[in-house]
Every structure is written in structure tokens, then in C-alpha cells.
């Protein structure tokens, strides 16, 4: 699904380094950095952030209060080829990008060549001990876009990296958990599994941009 929206909730504070700018006659989220996936770039070097290709972009467009202010240290799980994490690295501090598939990681390494603060890791997010020696403690933000069964389990296992006042920004894909279940039932189960480890601050369906997805904002208990 591509981003066919105009501006989202303009009253929500965006992180420093994320702006709404005009592309093709409409307002879109943008960050400033090297082009990655053919997105429009304006004369000042700001590139459109396509919420239809980015769960975190969708969360921001829908007005979710992510708690992001800019400059955070970030652990990004499910980085794939770097579409979303490239935007994150444009406005964040040290950004650790975990992806388990070798082919996307090759693309991710190319994205990191233009971003000194982006560190690709060919690792499995289900096994955080495999990268615990690399990722710094007290991370400000854990971003999760992991399309696998057991998404809540992955979030709980990676809680160890978060600062006490850190944030979990998670996109839950219902069909990755159970293709036969109703998405709302899946989302309820995921939230229930998260609650012993996280305080849930906000949830929102992302269907305007991504069918059968739930955005979650939480902080560690």
C-alpha cells in the first residue's frame, strides 16, 4: 500500500529532524538524508517518508504519541532493507538495526554507508543475547516491526536493552501470529502478553496504511 494521505494529525509534536513538507502539492512527513527507496527529495534535501511503506511512519501520521524527540539511541528489530530505519537514523542518535535475512542486510549495509550512526546487525531478534555484546545498555527506544509468530515474546526478551524511561514502539502484524484468527483477538492476546513487562501507553489500528496491523506505544515496568 502506498501513501496516498495528506497531512495527519498536525497537532502532535514530531521529533526534531522530522518535518511535514510539501511533495507533489501535499504535505508529507519527511527527514533529511540520502535517498534510499526512490522516495521524492526536495531541493533542501528532505525526503518524503512513505507511511504506506513504514509502520512507524504510519504511527506518526496517525498522531500516536511515540515519545520521540530526536537524538535518541534506538534498537530497531526487523530492519529489512532499511526503508524505515533509514528515516529513523536521519533524526536519531546511535541506531542498531537488527535483520536476520542476509539479502536485505546487504541493502542495509549500503544504506548505512551514508549514515555514520546506523549499525546493521545480521542477527535474529528472537535471540537478543547474540547481539547483547554490541548494543549499548539503556537504549531510549526499541522499535519493532518483526513479522513472525511470537511478536510479544520478542518484545519482552529485548526489554533488557531499554532504559527505565525508554519506549517500545511496536507494529503487530495479526496475520503473522495466526492467519485464521480475528485480528482484534490477536491484538488482545499480544497486549496481554506484553503487560507483565510493559505499561501500555497507546494503541491504534494502522489499517489506513497497513491492513491488520496494530501500533503499540509502551514503556518498561
Model regions and ranges:
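Conserved SAM-binding loop of SAM-dependent methyltransferases across substrates and taxa
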Residues: 81-92
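S-adenosyl-L-methionine
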Residues: 98-151
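C-terminal substrate-binding/active-site "lid" region of AdoMet-derived donor-dependent transferases
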Residues: 2-5, 12, 155-221
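Residues at the starts of beta-strands that form the adenosine-phosphate
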Residues: 73, 93-94, 117, 167
Amino acid at each position: 500500500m502506498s501513501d496516498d494521505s495528506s497531512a495527519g494529525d498536525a497537532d502532535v509534536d514530531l521529533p526534531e529532524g522530522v518535518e511535514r513538507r510539501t511533495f507533489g502539492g501535499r504535505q508529507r512527513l519527511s527527514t533529511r538524508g540520502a535517498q534510499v527507496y526512490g522516495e521524492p527529495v526536495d531541493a533542501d534535501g528532505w525526503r518524503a517518508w512513505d507511511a504506506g511503506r513504514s509502520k512507524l511512519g504510519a504511527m506518526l501520521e496517525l498522531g500516536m504519541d511515540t515519545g520521540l524527540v530526536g537524538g535518541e539511541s534506538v534498537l530497531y528489530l526487523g530492519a529489512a532493507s532499511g526503508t524505515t530505519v533509514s528515516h529513523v537514523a536521519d533524526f536519531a542518535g546511535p541506531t542498531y538495526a537488527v535483520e536476520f535475512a542476509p539479502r536485505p542486510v546487504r541493502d542495509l549495509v549500503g544504506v548505512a554507508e551514508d549514515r555514520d550512526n546506523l549499525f546493521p546487525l545480521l542477527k535474529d531478534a528472537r535471540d537478543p543475547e547474540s547481539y547483547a555484546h554490541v548494543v549499548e545498555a539503556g537504549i531510549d527506544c526499541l522499535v519493532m516491526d518483526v513479522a513472525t509468530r511470537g511478536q510479544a515474546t520478542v518484545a519482552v526478551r529485548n526489554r533488557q536493552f531499554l532504559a527505565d524511561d525508554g519506549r517500545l514502539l511496536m507494529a503487530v502484524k495479526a496475520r503473522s501470529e495466526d492467519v485464521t484468527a480475528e485480528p482484534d483477538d490477536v491484538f488482545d492476546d499480544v497486549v496481554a502478553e506484553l503487560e507483565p513487562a510493559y505499561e501500555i501507553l497507546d494503541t491504534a489500528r494502522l489499517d489506513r496504511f497497513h491492513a491488520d496491523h496494530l501500533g503499540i506505544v509502551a514503556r518498561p515496568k
